[in-house]
Regions:
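N-terminal secretory signal peptides that target proteins for export/translocation
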Residues: 1-10
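Flexible "cap/lid" subdomain of the alpha/beta-hydrolase fold that forms the substrate-access gate
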Residues: 31-46, 50-55, 60-67, 95, ...
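Active-site glycine-rich loops that stabilize anionic/oxyanionic intermediates
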Residues: 73-76, 142
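Alpha/beta-hydrolase active-site loop signature
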Residues: 75, 100-103, 169, 302-305
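Serine-hydrolase catalytic-loop signature spanning alpha/beta hydrolases and amidase-signature enzymes
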Residues: 75-83, 94
Length: 322
């Protein structure tokens, strides 16, 4: 009888424990399943024919929501905006193309395709027309600045607001680092070999991301090693050196862009990485000189500030676009 009683008590104890475990495990399982559900606005990866070229782009968010058109920098692609896609697509329609010669878009032969900022801006304007994007907020990073400002001057009626992230529209914004690059513009033949060596090197590709940030552990090395691989593919040396030579035309156009901003006083948000090493730290205030009501935010990042400050930037963008 004692043995039977002991067995009964053990059985009740085991039963009680199993009930408790079931009670505690159910919410965990439910929570786990909830995490596995598809997001409401997944990113789509598409291509579209524009001017005889296959243009790759990322898209997410409801198409009837305000559109955010994101223009990438060098030597990046639309991939750089992935951190914003996952943070903003619940409320906004995000579209980020790869320029010709970048990312997953076509890389036409430089002997047959003019790699100039005028030409890329023209293709990007035609891209927006092909997608039916008639109104958008323009988000411009690095090369996105000269591409975007050309798009603005061609079709100012399409632009609702501007977001500038580490992109330059003032001569002083280039800073002392651009002395050797100006030498390339002055004499391409004498300086092209040195420029290519520097532009395509792993050290320079890494420096664009890390900049002066002392917190190296925050930076994912895959971001610059992937870009380094991309830069060392066939045609890239010719494509990038052509485009970098044409960068001199951006400096020539700065007064036009500044005049447009001073006249139109657009809604303007400037986001700048405090560890930016490619451009001069005076540039954000130069924008505010043109547009006194511009919002300026210095964030905890470098030239590619989304690498380390995506949460901060997403909050800033949400507040700006309300």
């Amino acid at each position: 009888m004692k043995l039977a009683g002991s067995c009964l008590r053990v059985s009740r104890l085991v039963f009680g424990i199993s009930v408790m475990l079931a009670a505690f495990s159910s919410p965990v399982q439910a929570q786990g399943h909830e995490k596995e559900r598809p997001v409401e606005n997944p990113i789509s990866y598409r291509t579209i024919q524009v001017d005889g070229l296959s243009i790759f782009y990322r898209e997410a968010g409801p198409k009837d929501a305000p559109t955010l058109l994101l223009l990438h920098g060098l030597p990046s692609s639309s991939r750089m905006f992935d951190p914003l896609f996952v943070r903003l697509a619940d409320r906004y329609h995000l579209v980020a193309p790869d320029y010709p010669g970048f990312g997953h878009s076509d890389w036409p032969d430089p002997k047959k395709f003019a790699y100039t900022f005028d030409h890329i801006a023209e293709v990007m304007n035609h891209f927006t027309e092909a997608l039916g994007l008639s109104r958008y907020t323009l988000y411009m990073q690095d090369y996105g600045g000269p591409v975007g400002f050309r798009m603005i001057l061609a079709h100012p009626e399409r632009v609702e607001a501007l977001i500038v992230q580490d992109a330059v529209a003032h001569n002083e914004g280039l800073g002392a680092n651009w002395k050797t690059r100006r030498a390339y513009w002055a004499d391409r033949a004498a300086n092209e070999a040195a420029l290519r060596t520097n532009l395509l090197s792993l050290a320079t590709t890494r420096a664009r991301h890390v900049g002066d940030d002392p917190n190296l552990e925050r930076h994912d090395p895959d971001l610059w090693t992937d870009e380094y691989y991309f830069l060392n593919q066939a045609r890239q040396a010719d494509i990038q050196s052509d485009l970098f030579y044409d960068y001199r035309t951006n400096v020539e156009n700065y007064p036009k862009w500044q005049a447009w901003m001073r006249e139109k006083q657009p809604r303007l948000l400037v986001i700048w990485g405090k560890y930016e090493s490619s451009f001069d730290p005076s540039e954000p205030e130069s924008y505010r000189r043109d547009v006194p009501k511009a919002e300026v935010h210095i964030v905890d990042g470098g030239h590619f500030a989304l690498d380390t400050a995506a949460d901060e930037i997403a909050i800033i963008v949400r507040e700006f676009m309300k």
